[in-house]
C-alpha cells in the first residue's frame, strides 16, 4: 500500500508533517502517470497540457513572497511541492511527447525551481518521466520508496 511504502521510506527519520503530506501527493502523481499511460492511448491530450499549465501557473503566482517561516499565517502555495508538481507536469508531458521544448510549461517549471532551490526539479522530472511502464507491485513500491526518500530526506535509493 501507499502508506506502507511511505512508512518504509521514512523509517527512523523525523519528517515535517507538511513533507509527509507532500509524499502522499507525490504518490498520487505516480498513480496519475500510470493512469495517463492508459488514458492517453485512447483519448486525445488536447486538454491535459493546458490543465497542467494553468495549475502550475496558479501555484507559481500564489507562492509566498516572504522567506518561509515555521508557521505560515496566510495560505499560499508551498514552493517545495510546487517544484515537485512542476517536475510531475514536465515528466508527464515528456513521457508522452506532448509539448515542444519551447513550451511555456518549461518557463513555469523554471520559476517553480527557483522558488525551491533545495528541490532538484530536473531529477524529479527524470524520475516521473522514466517510471517503469506497467510495473509490478514490487517495482512500484521501490519507485515510491525512492521518490519519497528523495523528497523528504534528500536521501538514498531503496535496495533491490
Model region roles, listed by residue range:
Residues 24-45:
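An active-site-proximal "capping" alpha-helix that borders the catalytic cofactor pocket
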Residues 1-29:
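Post-HEXXH active-site segment of zinc metalloproteases
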Residues 44-160:
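Pan-zinc metallopeptidase signature
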Amino acid at each position: 500500500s501507499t502508506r506502507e511504502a511511505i512508512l518504509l521510506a521514512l523509517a527512523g527519520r523525523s519528517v515535517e508533517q507538511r513533507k509527509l503530506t507532500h509524499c502522499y501527493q507525490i504518490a498520487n502523481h505516480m498513480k496519475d502517470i500510470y493512469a495517463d499511460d492508459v488514458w492517453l492511448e485512447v483519448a486525445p491530450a488536447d486538454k491535459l497540457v493546458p490543465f497542467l499549465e494553468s495549475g502550475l501557473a496558479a501555484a507559481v503566482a500564489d507562492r509566498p513572497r516572504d522567506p518561509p517561516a515555521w508557521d505560515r499565517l496566510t495560505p499560499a502555495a508551498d514552493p517545495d511541492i510546487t517544484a515537485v508538481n512542476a517536475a510531475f507536469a514536465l515528466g508527464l508531458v515528456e513521457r508522452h511527447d506532448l509539448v515542444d521544448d519551447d513550451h511555456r510549461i518549461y518557463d513555469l517549471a523554471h520559476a517553480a525551481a527557483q522558488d525551491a532551490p533545495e528541490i532538484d526539479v530536473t531529477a524529479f522530472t527524470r524520475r516521473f518521466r522514466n517510471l517503469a511502464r506497467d510495473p509490478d507491485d514490487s517495482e512500484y513500491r521501490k519507485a515510491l520508496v525512492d521518490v519519497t526518500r528523495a523528497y523528504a530526506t534528500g536521501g538514498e535509493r531503496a535496495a533491490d
